[in-house]
Curated annotation (Swiss-Prot):
GO cellular component, one term: cytoplasm
Pfam families named in the record: MraZ
InterPro entries reported in the protein's UniProt record: MraZ, MraZ_C, MraZ_dom, MraZ_N, MraZ_sf, SpoVT-AbrB_dom, SpoVT-AbrB_sf
Sequence ranges assigned to domain SpoVT-AbrB in this UniProt record: 7-56, 85-128
Family designation: Belongs to the MraZ family.
Protein name, entry field: Transcriptional regulator MraZ
Transmembrane segments: none
Organism: Chlorobium phaeobacteroides (strain DSM 266 / SMG 266 / 2430)
Domain of life the protein comes from: Bacteria
């Protein structure tokens, strides 16, 4: 898999479903494109919604499994992640349904921007993404110099 790369603008349909862009559907694993395929949705702390294929989520789940329920910080992290997680079916047309809870979390009414971020897709309300980019332009420059 080459990974999800790029940015697409789309609109949810009247039932709150997102059509996965063709360029991203091509990158889905065969297990994620057949009948009964699923995708994991997570309400990200930054106000976006992240979409993970099952095989990617399984790797993340293993990382969470080693955290101790007896360590308050680790237990809190697990609770917060699992509270923000859902698994939904991708329909035959490649649509992903979003619950009202997820749409409200992200401030999404109809239009969205989908960013391919290698192993995941990140869904933003356009206004929130524009504000994030504008408010963090200098910080981005500093981070890019530090890590690249």
């Amino acid at each position: 898999m080459a990974g999800f790369i790029g940015k697409e603008r789309h609109a949810l349909d009247e039932k709150g479903r997102l059509m996965i862009p063709v360029r991203f559907r091509r990158e889905l694993s065969p297990e994620s494109t057949g009948r009964g395929s699923t995708i994991y949705l997570m309400k990200a702390p930054d106000g976006s919604i992240e979409l993970y294929e099952p095989d990617i989520w399984e790797g993340m789940k293993k990382s969470l499994a080693v955290l101790s329920d007896f360590n308050p910080e680790e237990r809190l992290l697990k609770t917060m992640i699992y509270e923000s997680l859902d698994v939904v079916a991708i329909d035959r047309q490649g649509r992903v349904p979003f619950s009202r809870e997820f749409l409200e979390h992200a401030g999404i009414v109809r239009d969205v921007v989908i960013i391919g971020a290698d192993t995941k897709m990140i869904v933003w309300a356009p206004e929130r993404l524009s504000l994030l980019v504008m408010e963090n332009a200098e910080r981005y420059s500093s981070l890019a110099r530090r890590y690249f």
